[in-house]
Swiss-Prot record:
Keywords for the protein's UniProt record, in alphabetical order: Amino-acid biosynthesis, Cell inner membrane, Cell membrane, Cysteine biosynthesis, Membrane, Sulfate transport, Transmembrane, Transmembrane helix, Transport
Membrane topology, as annotated: Multi-pass membrane protein
Transferase found in the keyword field: no
Keyword ATP-binding: no
Name used for this protein in its record: Sulfate transporter CysZ
NCBIfam families from the UniProt entry: PRK04949.1
One cellular component (GO) term of this entry: plasma membrane
Species name: Haemophilus influenzae (strain 86-028NP)
Record's function text: High affinity, high specificity proton-dependent sulfate transporter, which mediates sulfate uptake. Provides the sulfur source for the cysteine synthesis pathway.
Transmembrane annotation, as ranges: 29-49, 66-86, 148-168, 219-239
Recorded family membership: Belongs to the CysZ family.
Molecular function, one GO term: high-affinity sulfate:proton symporter activity
Length: 272
């Protein structure tokens, strides 16, 4: 069910992301994600332009003759599906490459909001976190890949593949964008992936609104070059205002006496 308050808050966090990237003290942490985003988007655009014609012809071959009168609508939906599949490719590569930089940006935004340190600022501490961040990106890929394959297989079904699948693909993309960018502040506190999904799912309208705005802006020229750090900043604000206290954290990473839970465990989510 649509929650209007969550709809507004999802929009609010996205807008605030734009505010944060202009803040003094954060700009130098924003530059690297923007440069990486620019390189990856240029590569994706070249790949899309070179392959779009063949991809459209391939998809349209699955439309039966008796639906030819809907060809324009179905063609549009097919192109949207292809765009979203290319987008998945982009986010997968960008997630792995930019993870350490996005994690650092999320850490600095949270420090600005709370005036409390999460980790040491030493290079050794940052490098120590890189393997964990990359493992987390692999975990997100393992979560999304079976669903992407399922949507891909559904696209072979006449009519369903050109009508329902684009809608499902868009909704799933919105959900994955919320997971992708909210994961950076969650992971900085070593919150398990499953607990993060549950937390975001408890405010699903907010998550889908935020992820939907990120997804849509990715297809807008110039804006898409900035969207990665914007999304990280907005997602970090969302974490601080919605989840940080509810998950029972203090900045010494001890678990809350109120819940008795430590959400840092990757295996069970509970420390006995």
């Amino acid at each position: 069910m649509l929650n209007l308050n969550e709809l507004k808050s999802g929009f609010h966090y996205f807008v605030m992301g734009w505010h944060f990237i202009t803040q003094k003290g954060l700009r130098r942490f924003v530059i690297i994600p923007i440069l990486l985003n620019t390189i990856l988007l240029c590569g994706l655009f070249w790949l899309f332009i070179s392959q779009i014609s063949s991809a459209i012809d391939w998809v349209m071959n699955f439309i039966p003759d008796w639906l030819s009168f809907l060809s324009v609508i179905l063609l549009t939906l097919s192109i949207l599906t292809i765009l979203l599949l290319f987008y998945f490719t982009f986010t997968t590569f960008s997630g792995f490459i930019a993870a350490p930089f996005n994690g650092l940006l999320a850490e600095k935004v949270e420090k600005m909001l709370t005036e409390e340190n999460i980790n040491d600022d030493s290079l050794v501490d940052i490098m120590r976190d890189v393997p964990r961040m990359l493992a987390r990106e692999w975990q997100k890929l393992r979560y999304s890949l079976p669903k992407i394959i399922a949507l891909f297989l559904l696209s072979f079904i006449p009519l369903v593949g050109q009508t329902i699948v684009p809608v499902l693909t868009f909704l799933f993309t919105c959900w994955m964008m919320a997971i992708q960018y909210c994961d950076y502040p969650f992971d900085n506190h070593k919150v398990s992936f499953d607990i993060m999904k549950t937390a975001l799912g408890n405010q699903r309208t907010q998550s889908l609104t935020f992820g939907g705005l990120v997804t849509c802006c990715t297809f807008v020229p110039v804006i898409n070059l900035l969207i990665m750090p914007v999304a990280v900043c907005g997602a970090t604000l969302m974490w601080v205002e919605n989840y940080r206290n509810d998950l029972g954290f203090n900045m010494n990473r001890s678990f809350s006496s109120q819940t008795g839970l430590d959400v840092r465990s990757e295996n069970t989510g509970i420390v006995k």
